[in-house]
Curated annotation (Swiss-Prot):
The gene is Dnajc14. InterPro entries: DnaJ_domain, J_dom_sf, Jiv, Viral_replicn-host_int_reg. This is DnaJ homolog subfamily C member 14. Residues 1-229, 622-643, 659-703 are annotated as: Disordered. It comes from the Eukaryota. Residues 75-84 have a biased composition (Pro residues). Residues 193-202, 219-228, 691-703 have a biased composition (Basic residues). SMART domains: DnaJ. Residues 121-133, 673-684 have a biased composition (Polar residues). The chain crosses the membrane at residues 305-325, 327-347. It is found in: Endoplasmic reticulum membrane. The lineage of its organism: Eukaryota, Metazoa, Chordata, Craniata, Vertebrata.
Length: 703
């Protein structure tokens, strides 16, 4: 076991089993390391060949002995410096032997760590004071954490003021350690050394008060060490800032040097150029001028060649495009001419074929059927039907859902109403003001609200709210908005009250039934009247035959096969035309300024005339022939109507005069010797006219 020097203290390793001094062999510790750590002077070789590191104890790392612990057997062996060896304890020899064994183990471990890492695993802790301390200072006590650090305090430097330092350092208990980018506490081997908190441990003792005297105690655990660590870290932060500034200054210095070098290179290059230009001769300048001229001429020639090539290419391409466009235009013009020619030929062929097949009659019948009141009545019923209205609403809704229609509607700012249409407030006010003169009893609330009569209560309420927002005087600044809102309110009062709504619906149903009956009667009467007007009286069968109005003008009414054209016709002209390769013959007549098809009447009269003649073969006379006169005679317009057909003709604004009743012999005018009892034959009843029929002179056709 190495002997302890009275004025020195060895670095001790802390173990939970007991404390031992740290000693190394002479060959294991490098003198350079000792000089580096500042321990060369404090290193000493023990008599047994062991090299010991001594540490001068100071007042900061010493602790005075406590005699109370010596005399009190309950405290066990003392932890701090004990009494003089002369007093001695019976267990001192045993403790020394144990310490020597532990010292040897620690020395071997330190040697092994130094050989592996290449750096010492211990650092010297120089004393903070110059006092020698007391002889026989024992090894420091072990820390509670077992980190292997221990220290001893000099009893000359320990004072009760340390208790006051404990109170001053309470503010450092909760502070977090400062962090910097670089760790200044690392050693050169890269191995993390023990922190100062672990290096400087103070003995923790209980405060013992004996006979009113306060025993000096060491400061709190880790407090002084933490204070030093905070101070070192602040110092390290300052050093780090200084180091960063030094690095920045060094980088700026190198940049400045590089800039100066670059400027020098440019200056050197310029000098070389100037020197080279100074050595040039006049002939060199002439050669340079010639060389520049040659290259300029070459570049000019190349440019002219490129320009000529590009211009020729452009003109060739343009000419080719023009020729292609001309050819395409010629083909299009030819195709258009062929198409128009085919259309013209097809139209002529269709017209000729239709004339041969009698398509004009069918076309006239089709147009007459389309214009018939029955078809109009059916269309009206279809429009008033509920499925048709639902289909219309569905189509309107689909149209309004289209993206471009929605965008246009949003730009215009229109407001939708319940019926699906979009109107502006001004338009709604104008629409409501058109019904201002309608009495309230005759007001149609559904028309006012813009919904159908079959709308539900929800649809009615929705329509009323939307219209109320648009036409309310507070929302709409129209001068007559209040009047329009009153009309809307009156309509809402009718449909919102169940009794008034039921009464209105009953009234509407009665009006609809009456109007439907009247419309049916009038439509039937109109059909009968039109049928009566489009019939001809037949003197042969005493019946009526239908006539069909043709879509022909009087100026081009008759077809002539000799001239292959249409000739004009006069009032009363009667002619025939053939169709279907001459298999069908149709009879026409010009009556009342219109061309009629009277084939039925002519067939009953058994008239046989040649078709498609140049001249009119027959002429129908609608007037009376005065005895002693010859030629064409027509009744005067002043003659009164003879039958119901004349009366109906006047009702339907047919010009008065002879009617096309199919009778070639009108009633003769009363002579001067005749009495007033004589009547025209047309006014005589059928039963009485039969015996008098023989007295008539028949001249049906006059040329």
């Amino acid at each position: 076991m190495a002997q302890k020097h009275p004025g020195e203290r060895r670095l001790c390793g802390a173990h939970r089993s007991g404390g031992t001094s740290l000693s190394t062999s002479g060959s294991s510790v490098d003198p350079e390391i000792l000089s580096f750590s500042g321990l060369r002077d404090s290193a000493e070789t023990a008599p047994n060949g062991t090299r010991c590191l001594k540490e001068h104890s100071g007042p900061k790392y010493t602790q005075p002995p406590n005699p109370a612990h010596w005399s009190d057997p309950s405290h066990g062996p003392p932890r701090g410096p004990g009494p003089p060896r002369g007093g001695g304890y019976p267990d001192e020899s045993e403790t020394g032997s144990e310490e020597s064994g532990v010292d040897q183990e620690l020395s071997r471990e330190n040697e092994t760590g130094y050989q592996e890492d290449g750096s010492p695993s211990f650092l010297s802790i120089p004393s903070a004071c110059n006092c020698q301390g007391s002889p026989g200072v024992p090894e420091g006590t072990y820390s509670e954490e077992g980190d292997g650090s221990s220290s001893s305090l000099c009893h000359h430097c320990t004072s009760p003021a340390l208790g006051e330092d404990e109170e001053l350092e309470e503010e450092y208990d909760d502070e977090e350690p400062l962090k910097f980018p670089s760790d200044f506490s690392r050693v050169s081997s890269g191995k993390k050394p023990l922190s100062r908190r672990q290096k400087h441990r103070f003995l923790i003792k209980e405060d013992v008060r004996d006979s009113g005297r306060r025993e000096p105690k060491a400061p709190g655990r880790h407090r002084l060490a933490r204070k030093r660590s905070q101070t070192d870290k602040r110092r390290g932060l300052g050093l780090w800032g200084v180091e960063e500034l030094c690095q920045l200054g060094q980088a700026g210095f190198w940049w400045l040097i590089e800039l100066l070098v670059l400027v020098g290179e440019y200056v050197e290059t310029c000098g070389h150029l100037i020197y080279a230009c100074r050595k040039l001769k006049g002939s060199d300048l002439d050669l340079f001028r010639v060389w520049v001229g040659v290259w300029a001429r070459r570049l000019g020639g190349w440019a002219r060649m490129m320009f000529q090539f590009l211009s020729q290419s452009f003109f060739c391409v343009v000419g080719l495009l023009i020729r292609i466009l001309r050819v395409v235009g010629a083909f299009l013009l030819l195709a258009l001419a062929l198409f128009l020619g085919c259309l013209q030929l097809g139209w002529r062929f269709s017209v000729g074929l239709g004339n041969r097949l009698g398509w004009r009659d069918k076309t006239a019948w089709l147009f007459s059927w389309l214009g018939s009141p029955a078809l109009h009545h059916c269309l009206t019923l279809l429009k008033d039907s509920r499925p048709w209205q639902q289909l219309v609403r569905l189509i309107q809704w689909g149209w309004q859902e289209l993206p471009w229609v929605k965008q246009r509607t949003k730009k215009q700012g229109n407001a939708p109403v319940a019926s699906g249409r979009y109107c502006q407030p001004e338009e709604e006010v104008t629409r409501l003001l058109t019904m201002a003169g309608v009495p309230e009893d005759e007001l149609n609330p559904f028309h006012v609200l813009g919904v159908e009569a079959t709308a539900s209560d929800t649809e009615l309420k929705k329509a009323y709210r939307q219209l109320a927002v648009m036409v309310h005087p507070d929302k709409n600044h129209h001068p007559r908005a209040e009047e329009a809102f009153k009309i809307l309110r009156a309509a809402w009062d009718i449909v919102s009250n169940p009794e008034r709504r039921k009464e209105y619906e009953m009234k509407r149903m009665a009006e609809n039934e009456l109007s439907r009956s009247v419309n049916e009667f009038l439509s039937k009467l109109q059909d009968d009247l039109k049928e009566a007007m489009n019939t001809m009286m037949c003197s042969r069968c005493q019946g009526k035959h239908r006539r069909f109005e043709m879509d022909r003008e009087p100026k081009s009414a008759r077809y002539c096969a000799e001239c292959n054209r249409l000739h004009p016709a006069e009032e009363g002209d009667f002619w025939a035309e053939s169709s279907m390769l001459g298999l069908k013959i149709t009879y026409f007549a010009l009556m009342d300024g219109k061309v009629y098809d009277i084939t039925e009447w002519a067939g009953c009269q058994r008239v046989g005339i040649s078709p498609d003649t140049h001249r009119v073969p027959y002429h129908i006379s609608f007037g009376s022939r005065v005895p002693g006169t010859s030629g064409r005679q027509r009744a005067t317009p002043e003659s009164p109507p003879a039958d119901l057909q004349d009366f109906l003709s006047r009702i339907f604004q047919v010009p008065p005069g002879p009617m096309s009743n199919g009778n070639f012999f009108a009633a003769p005018h009363p002579g001067p010797g005749t009495t007033s009892t004589s009547r025209p034959n047309s006014s005589v009843p059928k039963g009485e006219a039969k015996p008098k029929r023989r007295k008539k002179v028949r001249r049906p056709f006059q040329r």
